[in-house]
Amino acid sequence: MQSAFRGRSDNGFMSIRPRRSASLERVTATATHVLLDDVGKAIVEQLQDDGRRSYATIARAVGLSEAAVRQRVARLQEAGVIQIVAVTDPLQLGFRRQAMVGVRVDGDVVVVADALAEMPEVDYVVITAGSFDVLVEAVCEDDDHLLELVGRRIRALPGVRSTETFVYMKLRKQHYNWGTR
């Protein structure tokens, strides 16, 4: 049975930290959720629409002062709730081949995932449950670069049993504005 601890965190947000059985502790030890009020959600949605939007514009939209918005955004960033970054288009930068690589692992999955995360071509690594132990997104200059990455570097890692590569043919959707629900 799972219960939750609710309390005020150091950053001023309400936090919920799940209490789990010992068998799940390893996976959930760092899980902390931030509950946003309606104004916090509105600020996040404004920034998801345009990460360069001024604090003054956001303040008008959400009904706060510019200083209050600036403080809330700073707290959201410090809490790790949001990041404000430039998202590039790999094709425009000469990276014409992207792929998802499913990796099956013998041994310590975390060690393999950490080694994959160190590769500069890899921009996404997730440990999964299912057919693959790890999924990796790779951004490469061309097919030869992808072949070298998968064939010579990923498959050569100790613990990698097999890989399956899913080459991206045409991107149909990639959004970062899923909201705050």
Predicted feature residues:
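A compositional/biophysical signature of low hydrophobicity enriched in polar/charged and small residues
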Residues: Q2-R181
